[in-house]
Curated annotation (Swiss-Prot):
GO CC annotations, alphabetized: cytoplasm
Principal place of residence: cytoplasm
Species this protein is from: Francisella tularensis subsp. holarctica (strain LVS)
SUPFAM superfamilies per record: S-adenosyl-L-methionine-dependent methyltransferases
Catalytic activity: uridine(2552) in 23S rRNA + S-adenosyl-L-methionine = 2'-O-methyluridine(2552) in 23S rRNA + S-adenosyl-L-homocysteine + H(+)
An example molecular function term from Gene Ontology annotations: rRNA (uridine-2'-O-)-methyltransferase activity
Record-given protein name: Ribosomal RNA large subunit methyltransferase E
Active site: K161 (proton acceptor)
Keywords linked to the UniProt accession: Cytoplasm, Methyltransferase, rRNA processing, S-adenosyl-L-methionine, Transferase
UniProt record similarity statement: Belongs to the class I-like SAM-binding methyltransferase superfamily. RNA methyltransferase RlmE family.
Name of the coding gene: rlmE
Native organism taxonomy: Bacteria, Pseudomonadati, Pseudomonadota, Gammaproteobacteria, Thiotrichales
Main function: Specifically methylates the uridine in position 2552 of 23S rRNA at the 2'-O position of the ribose in the fully assembled 50S ribosomal subunit.
Binding residues annotated for S-adenosyl-L-methionine, in chain numbering: G60, W62, D80, D96, D121
Localization terms from the record: Cytoplasm
Amino acid sequence: MSKGSSTKKWLHEHTSDYYVIQANKLGYRSRASFKILEIQDKYQLFKPNMFVVDLGASPGGWSEQVIKYIGKNGKLIALDLLEMAPIAGVEFIQGDFSSDETYQKLNTLVNNQKIDCVISDMAPNLSGNKTSDQAKSIYLLELALDFANTNLNKNGSFVAKVFQGQGSDEYLKLVRESFNKVIQFKPKSSRAKSREFYVIATEFKG
């Protein structure tokens, strides 16, 4: 299949996707909103007044939902390499999470406060080389976990997108070292063909 044909096929699948249609109908920023809504419905992670950090946030599908749960007295910092249109109540940092400069900006905003929940929908820019892409994905996941381990409240939570493949089982073992409860969850709104699942880790050991 040519590149043009595969692009047309993706566009057709995307525009006819139930969750894309629903997101447009409801005015959500992306179909990813449904994933975080499913996670919240099942695990009730987000509560009023919480402090949440959203990694890989653009275009804001998760942040726009989470801010509704934590309310005006909560705090939400969102970070992404790409631009994100403003969301009321959300502080946004544009930058590469793996760079020291961006990490420092995030730490400045965190300001030594303990975080209640770190959520990550980060994914690397895909090159088409599955081995390389998977390695980059695991690297970002390890950075997100390190950030959570450093900044979470005792009994805090961590949610991250994981792609099943080389290194994913080892990554889950690392998460289990830091949290008492670790669950693998694939939302209905994840595409059936996708290798993605979400790790839902609660009761941070601190």
